[in-house]
């Protein structure tokens, strides 16, 4: 029989920030969820994807899914 898929779910969080009305910078809070095979990919994922909060393509970096 075939082995069960060894992929993990990871969270890709936007690196974009937005200035609030009080003047402080905060993350947009937008994220994507992707599958990743830890045996093939040892480094952290980074993608340039669309962030609808800032309406631009920005860098998304991998974080652990809680």
Swiss-Prot record:
Pfam families linked to this entry: Ribosomal_L33
BP GO terms, sorted: translation
GO molecular function: structural constituent of ribosome
Listed Gene3D superfamilies: Ribosomal protein L33
Keyword Ribonucleoprotein recorded: yes
UniProt xrefs under InterPro entries: Ribosomal_bL33, Ribosomal_bL33_CS, Ribosomal_bL33_sf, Ribosomal_zn-bd
Keywords carried by this UniProt record: Ribonucleoprotein, Ribosomal protein
Gene Ontology CC: one annotated term: large ribosomal subunit
Family classification: Belongs to the bacterial ribosomal protein bL33 family.
PANTHER family: 54S RIBOSOMAL PROTEIN L39, MITOCHONDRIAL (PTHR15238), LARGE RIBOSOMAL SUBUNIT PROTEIN BL33M (PTHR15238:SF1)
Record's protein name: Large ribosomal subunit protein bL33
Organism encoding this protein: Wolbachia sp. subsp. Brugia malayi (strain TRS)
């Amino acid at each position: 029989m075939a082995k069960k898929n060894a992929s993990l779910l990871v969270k890709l969080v936007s690196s974009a920030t937005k200035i609030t009305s009080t003047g402080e910078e905060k993350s947009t809070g937008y994220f994507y969820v992707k599958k990743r095979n830890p045996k093939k990919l040892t480094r952290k994922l980074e993608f340039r994807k669309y962030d609808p909060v800032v309406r631009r393509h920005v860098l998304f970096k991998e974080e652990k899914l809680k």
